[in-house]
Amino acid sequence: MASKAKNTAAAAKAEGTAKRRIRKIFGDIHEVVKMPNLIEVQRESYEQFLRSNKEIDYVSGLEKTLRSVFPIRDFAGTAELDFVHYELEPPKYDTTECRQRGITYAAPMKVTLRLIVFEVDQETETRSVLDIKEQDVYMGDMPLMTGNGTFIINGTERVIVSQMHRSPGVLFDHDRGKTHSSGKLLFAARVIPYRGSWLDFEFDAKDIVNVRIDRKRKLPVTALLYALGLDSEEILHFFYNTVTWKRAGGKKGEGWKIPFEPEAWRGQKPTFALVDAKTGEEVFPANQKISPRAANKAQKDGLKDLLLPTEEVFARYAAKDMIDEKTGRIYIEAGDEVGPDHLEALDAAGIDELELLDIDEINTGPWIRNTLKVDKAENRDEGLEAIYKVMRPGEPPTKETAEALFEGLFFDGERYDLSAVGRVKLNMRLDLDAEDTVTTLRKEDILAVVKELVGLKDGKGDVDDIDNLGNRRVRSVGELLENQYRVGLLRMERAVKERMSSVDVSTVMPNDLINAKPAVAAVREFFGSSQLSQFMDQTNPLSEVTHKRRVSALGPGGLTRERAGFEVRDVHPTHYGRICPIETPEGPNIGLINSLSTFARVNKYGFIETPYRVVKDGKVTSEVIYLSAMEEQKHTVAQASAELTEDGTFVEELISARQNGDNLMAPSETVTLMDVSPKQLVSVAASLIPFLENDDANRALMGSNMQRQAVPLVKAEAPWVGTGMEETVARDSGAAITATRGGIVDQVDATRIVIRAIGDVEPGQSGVDIYTLQKFQRSNQNTCINQRPLVKVGETVEAGDVIADGPSTDLGELALGKNTLVAFMPWNGYNYEDSILISERIVKDDVFTSIHIEEFEVMARDTKLGPEDITRDIPNVGEEALRNLDEAGIVYIGAEVHPGDILCGKITPKGESPMTPEEKLLRAIFGEKASDVRDTSLRLPPGVAGTVVEVRVFNRHGIEVDDRTRAIQQEEIERLRKDSQDERTILNRATYNRLRDMLLGQTASAAPKGVKKGVKIDEALLEGIDRHEWFKFAVADDNRQQQIEAVKSQYDEAAKGIDDKFEDRKEKLERGDELAPGVLKMVKVFVAVKRKLQPGDKMAGRHGNKGVISRILPVEDMPFLEDGTPVDIVLNPLGVPSRMNVGQIFETHLGFAARGLGQQVKNALEDWRAANPDPEAGKPPEAVKETLQRVYGDRYEDDIAGRSNAEIIELASNLTAGVPMGTPVFDGAREGDVTTQLEAAGIDSSGQSVLYDGRTGEAFDRKVTVGIIYMLKLHHLVDDKIHARSIGPYSLVTQQPLGGKAQFGGQRFGEMEVWALQAYGAAYTLQEMLTVKSDDVVGRTKVYEAIVKGDDTFEAGIPESFNVLVKEMRSLGLNVELSSLTDGDEDDDGLQIAAE
């Protein structure tokens, strides 16, 4: 065990933020392999699609798709259009610009096509090339993937979710006895291609083998075999062995001799005695079971032939036709049952040998023979005809059409494609050896499938499991888009063919033939509206990562929710290490949408693989291999937690292992593989839950899902009790910025970091990296994306170091919530049923405050009555309402806005109405404007109040630019200019430093003005000359001179690159924007809203412990600890036992210990600071170092000892609040570890403390569990849900108020509420609810008028929905009328009808 611990410490040291803060990891298991990048799935797949790299053997690619459609030939064969190659040009706008302008991030695609024109000789029909033309054709834009694995489509980030579908190949299955009443198993086989017709083979209730093509009407399978070119005898010989029966002794009654095969007789119980044909002895008596041992012994004893009675020949089947050559008389046909008449005929002809099929009804059944007899077809033509009739009913078949149809179904690469995957699966299942380039079916494949199916019926082998991950594969972005693009290209091909036949081919160019619209439309449709192209969940970095790693079984070509049964949704043993058994949505999609496990990756065939360590001769090596579910089947896999000795052998004799889906205790020498890590089982979200092993699965599921809904807070704080995965997620999600190469920090401010690269810069590369930070950007979910620098000027960074924190990250670690002090106790019913009681301190100190950014936009369009105008000059609006607007009518940045405030003034012309003379006069006096326009300004909707953080103005090209737009443009150009200048400065500095080193000590063979030739160049000489002149030196050393010239050309190239980039961006800014048709100007206003925690907000821990805030209590009333610290949150202890998520209690205790240890570090640091006011001249902080070593233990001793004083102080000051711990999933702190930490922190090892009531000051009756829990604030905020309505929109038909906040709707008074009022007998309230408060149109207007006047009487009329009912009845021909009866009149039934 010791060896493991050291390894882990080394690993911990090697990884990132340990510089600023060490997370104390409790895990014992050393991980041999690094976790693959978390968004590799997306990037890898799209990279394969976009650039089919020539060096690597890619399976898919855009080029492959283009090659599969081209060459396109015209109908007459006089021309063909061929594909040469394609290239993607650089995109017009970068990702930021695309987001701002609302356009797609894509690269224009140029395809080089070659048009070959042939001349056809009329007589000989030979073709000769007449003309060849090549041309580059623009084929639309191809969306590009951003560095983080997303696409920007129309300005919004989208993710393409991978799809899980049935793998192409062959599947054998049975109906589980459900079809037939007897419960007998009907076996079936299905060949699934990647595209093309499905081929199904199935047994029916009469045990006949049938075939279906594309799920159409079934045919006997022999019809298909005939069509493949076999005759009945070949069919029988393929499926059955033959046995030669010879007459014994030639006399009629003596019986028949057959060779003795021990396998055939094992376990059988013949009704007759088995006699040795040679000796005549009885070997096995009648009606006795023959054991395998006895059968083998008989063979050893020399038994060669058996003698069987003549009756045994009857009811067996002939293997071939027996015909009298001379007369042509048929004695017996192949497949016929042998009867006494046949024997007589054969005896008469003197034939004493019979070839019979080896069908014994036990090991081999007569299924194919029976099918042959049922089949009406008897030769190839009839077989083809039968297939044609099923596929094209109603059309008369000719031999040619039938043959062409059959060929096209399975043997034509254009229409049928198994894909490499399908071929590999077919080969594996049926033991074939075709190359994986053979992607159509072959005759052998079909025969092998039928043979395997018949074998299953005979009890040989097993059926496949559809839910095994070996039979399901993943289609990622690249492949999905490839399929879509292919569809588009095929549509385009049709158009091109028609075009080629309608124009004169000799005069046209490829450009005239190609119309790329269908291909572009297919791509656009896929990204815009496919079920798998989803709006990215950007709530926090974890939700982004999870969304990209999601695998869905839904979508085109997948399952639907309604049809998916239990089996598909269930966890399967092959999910281990591939798909997370925990993380899946609750609700109708459960089990259909999954997440990849942490170490999983998708191989080139689309199967999910997971890594294992190789075990050789009982010794665990450090070699790691990735295996798919199929490859893993034959192995015995030990768990990652199995104990090992120093040299890697297993400590125990028997080891807990898995084999083919079963858990067993295996002897250590039989183990062949070992897990690489305990967390390879779970997904990213689940691996972030500490003490996951102590939580119930259902709650762990909720915990994983709710972490994805945590809102980024104003001040992020990493969890004190984590799992060590936090850093990986922050880094791979792209939320935290990492340095692309090592260097020295040159400049830092809030919006950018400039790093000067160290070491030799490759030619053509810039020697400086500028990282632009995102400031207060809006995410897809309206949360705030804000990045903060972590580095200081002069600091040295290495490639991969975190240099800036993003949303929900703290020092490069994921930080979704806050560490809060929690007590588990009831408090006056305020935490009944999962409610949460919180302290006012949390609100006051902005602990759970988050910023949300809302976007509002307004467009000025060109209307029929004239253009709309964005202006400050709005009719009937006072100066007070315009206080926040500038001259252009757009709100200032920094303005505080409230509901109803104008964000952007806009006026729209309204139709001319005829004017009265008075109006005309007023108009003449007071000017035009006022009456012919109406106010359509953008106002802040109710429920939103905040600060304007950004305004963007977009103008159509050619429209005059207003001042505000000009100001925004100038600001942006200044920023670009600054970037450009900084890059130039650093380039100059680096170049001249290199040049100085090269020139010093050299002899000048040429020199700038004022310097003599032949001088030796030294420091003083160089200092006296302007740096720009240095390049004029030439030196005598030729070698050095070449180097100097190389530096010069490199410098010129880099400088030109910097200038070009600046000019290009500036030009883009000054160019007009591409707006939707009819839009002249668009303004976007971003308002930042601060959301404090308030009652009704939802909070949760990481263990599925969720609740809603019920009350915010003043600090002084909260229960407090002995040292006077009030707790932050009071949770209900009853939420733990029934839910069985005990992990939260472990977390509470360990978190409390972390807080206590942090306190100790803080005290040591404060003592040192008090003794050393001047840290530079002070003593080394030995006491602080000792405290740190005590807190962290032996494992981190070397790390802490190796740090400088300044680093020790920085480390300690980051730990004063609490010491971060890491308890990896399934390998974390045990109960003993938690107790030890509590004791080290000086806390009672029970983890319980005496609490005092804040209101009375008395101690509570018994000790209470108090500790630190990491709480998250979830995206379900009460502000987004609550709203109020007085009068609002009504539904058109029923005239009832709409529902929901988005529609500004009302509260539904439903059936149950009506029953409640009925039960109370509240007749008038009920009448009011159902009439004037709902859909009595006249009544509700009257009520409104009455209320305005201060009156409170009203009269209920007929609800509109009653009128709708009446009209519906009339539409059915039932006339219903309401007529009022005078008092005293009764209708026929004696019922009084009230007056209308």
UniProtKB/Swiss-Prot annotation:
SUPFAM superfamilies in alphabetical order: beta and beta-prime subunits of DNA dependent RNA-polymerase
Enzyme Commission number: 2.7.7.6
One Gene Ontology biological process: DNA-templated transcription
Signal listed as a keyword: no
The keyword Nucleotidyltransferase is annotated on this UniProt entry: yes
Reactions catalysed: RNA(n) + a ribonucleoside 5'-triphosphate = RNA(n+1) + diphosphate
InterPro entries the UniProt entry points to: DNA-dir_RNA_pol_bsu_ext_1_sf (IPR042107), DNA-dir_RNA_pol_bsu_external_1 (IPR019462), DNA-dir_RNA_pol_su2 (IPR015712), DNA-dir_RNAP_su2_dom (IPR007120), DNA-dir_RNAP_su2_hyb_sf (IPR037033), RNA_pol_bsu_bac (IPR010243), RNA_pol_bsu_CS (IPR007121), RNA_pol_bsu_protrusion (IPR007644)
UniProt cross-references to Pfam families, sorted A to Z: RNA_pol_Rpb2_1, RNA_pol_Rpb2_2, RNA_pol_Rpb2_3, RNA_pol_Rpb2_45, RNA_pol_Rpb2_6, RNA_pol_Rpb2_7
One Gene Ontology term, aspect cellular component: DNA-directed RNA polymerase complex
Domain of life: Bacteria
Coiled coil: none
Cysteine disulfide partners in this protein: none
UniProtKB keywords: DNA-directed RNA polymerase, Nucleotidyltransferase, Transcription, Transferase
Any one GO molecular function term: ribonucleoside binding
HAMAP family reported for this sequence: RNApol_bact_RpoB
Assembly and oligomerization: The RNAP catalytic core consists of 2 alpha, 1 beta, 1 beta' and 1 omega subunit. When a sigma factor is associated with the core the holoenzyme is formed, which can initiate transcription.
Function, as annotated: DNA-dependent RNA polymerase catalyzes the transcription of DNA into RNA using the four ribonucleoside triphosphates as substrates.
Family: Belongs to the RNA polymerase beta chain family.
This protein's name: DNA-directed RNA polymerase subunit beta
